[in-house]
Amino acid sequence: MYRAVTRQIEVTVEPNFLPEKSSVADGRWFWSYTVVITNTGEDTVKLRSRHWIITDGVGRQQEVRGEGVVGEQPVLAPGERFEYTSGVPLTTASGFMAGSYQMESASGEQFDIAVPAFSLDSPDGGKRVLN
């Protein structure tokens, strides 16, 4: 599990390789990742947007920006948490992701919180096994 804390908001990420959605022969690898955002502070916050940088195994980068996460802009009161699962395809057997969420406090202040960089690894490293 990967973890980052910014302004008393904890973000943890757990990636999971999905062999059933991946195909070495087609050069396609797929991972899910589960994110848990926990508000350990004293102020209510709202997740406004996301920013991801996805890097594949040969260094190609893709930048993704958008409103909310999985179609939602969750509001987290003190002590509350929000969990979601999403997915990412790559054309290499490994890579990594990192990013941030833009949050808004109840008073309207906007600020970014870190999403920890996390590794996307396939168990076989993308190698074909010949019998």
From Swiss-Prot:
It holds the Pfam family DUF525. InterPro entries: ApaG_domain, ApaG_sf, Uncharacterised_ApaG. The gene is apaG. Residues 3-127 form the ApaG domain. SUPFAM superfamilies: ApaG-like. PANTHER family: F-BOX ONLY PROTEIN 3, POLYMERASE DELTA-INTERACTING PROTEIN 2. This is Protein ApaG. GO terms for biological process: error-free translesion synthesis. It comes from the Bacteria.
